[in-house]
C-alpha cells in the first residue's frame, strides 16, 4: 500500500491532543527526509540477520520499525542493507539503535532514522522477533498502522 506523505506538523494539527507523536529524538540518515507507509516491525538486539531477511522481501512502500533496544554498540543497518531495502520497495526504516556508512546512506533514496552511528558490525545469528508491537518514545508501533516521518518528527495514525 503506497501512502501519500503528509507533514507531521499538519497531522498533529488535524488530530489534536490524541496524536501519537514519538518523543524519542532520531537523526536523519537516508537520502529521503520525508517518508510514510504501513508499519512492519522487528525486535532484535545487536543482530541484524532477521532485519536483513525482512528487507529482502518486496514491499509496496512499507516502513520497517526496528527495536534494537537503543543499543549504539553495533550498527543494525549499513549501506548494503539500506540498498537492499530501497531496491525492494521499502519507503523507510526507523531504527532504535545505530547505523553505519552514514555518508553512503545519504546517497540512497530511502528514509532512514536512527539514534546514532557505530562502525562496528552486528552479529548475524538471526535472533529476534517479527510482527510484534514496538514501543518507542511513548508511542506503540503496531504492524499495519501507518507511520509518517519528516524533519519535525514521527507520527503514527
From Swiss-Prot:
GO BP annotations, alphabetical order: regulation of RNA metabolic process
Cofactors required: a divalent metal cation
Subunit structure: Homotrimer.
Molecular function GO terms recorded: 4-hydroxy-4-methyl-2-oxoglutarate aldolase activity; metal ion binding; oxaloacetate decarboxylase activity; ribonuclease inhibitor activity
Note on how the cofactor is bound: Divalent metal cation.
Gene3D superfamilies in the cross-refs: Ribonuclease E inhibitor RraA/RraA-like
Entry keyword RNA-binding: no
InterPro entries, A to Z: RraA (IPR010203), RraA/RraA-like (IPR005493), RraA/RraA-like_sf (IPR036704)
Species this chain originates from: Mycobacterium leprae (strain TN)
Role description: Catalyzes the aldol cleavage of 4-hydroxy-4-methyl-2-oxoglutarate (HMG) into 2 molecules of pyruvate. Also contains a secondary oxaloacetate (OAA) decarboxylase activity due to the common pyruvate enolate transition state formed following C-C bond cleavage in the retro-aldol and decarboxylation reactions.
Family to which the UniProt record says this protein belongs: Belongs to the class II aldolase/RraA-like family.
Superkingdom assignment: Bacteria
UniProtKB keywords: Lyase, Metal-binding
Enzyme class per UniProt: lyase
Ligand binding (a divalent metal cation): 101
Annotated catalysed reactions: 4-hydroxy-4-methyl-2-oxoglutarate = 2 pyruvate; oxaloacetate + H(+) = pyruvate + CO2
PANTHER family for the chain: 4-HYDROXY-4-METHYL-2-OXOGLUTARATE ALDOLASE 3-RELATED
Name of this chain's protein: Putative 4-hydroxy-4-methyl-2-oxoglutarate aldolase
NCBIfam families, per the entry: NOT-MenG, PRK09372.1
Binding site for substrate: 78-81, 100
EC number(s) per entry: 4.1.3.17, 4.1.1.112
